Amino acid sequence: NKTSEIEDGLGAILGFDFKIKEKGNDREKLSLSLGQVFNYELNRDIPSKSSLDQKMSDVVGKINYNFSKIGNIGYKFLLDNNLDDLNYNEVSTELNFGPVQFNLDYLEENKHVGLEHYASSGISLNFNDQNKLSFSTKRNFKTDSTELYNLSYQYEIDCLTAGVVYRREFYQDSELEPN
């Protein structure tokens, strides 16, 4: 049935995964993945946001590095098939220092992928196994504004989780102009 087909024609996928594990255990220390799709013809049935409609898709990549026991950092990207433009950048990191956890995320989308560009961060404090206090925020670089603040308290036992969340969201009204 031709109407249910999304992909047809000749194509190939080229990619690799590389991993390094810690000595003495099976924990992944470093991982690297890279890939690209090659098609014999253009395929207009696939959305252009993915670049899979082109003869050569964007180069997709992902790198993860795990620090000893304190955290990790990851990087995901889309490199345009001309190898000149980064259409997607995402960096995320987590750090764990016992009862305190930090996270920081950065995202930038360009061209056919999207228009997002922001950083978000958070901190959590675990008082004990049942009580947790968290704060997070998100900064939008396109609008040069803070989008939200989140402050939460969570209490958790066996099969019950209760919490209180204060969330302050900021928005931009296109009809309002600053003084």
Where are these regions (language model features)?
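Outer-membrane beta-barrel translocator/pore domains, especially the C-terminal barrels
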Residues: 1-154, 158-179
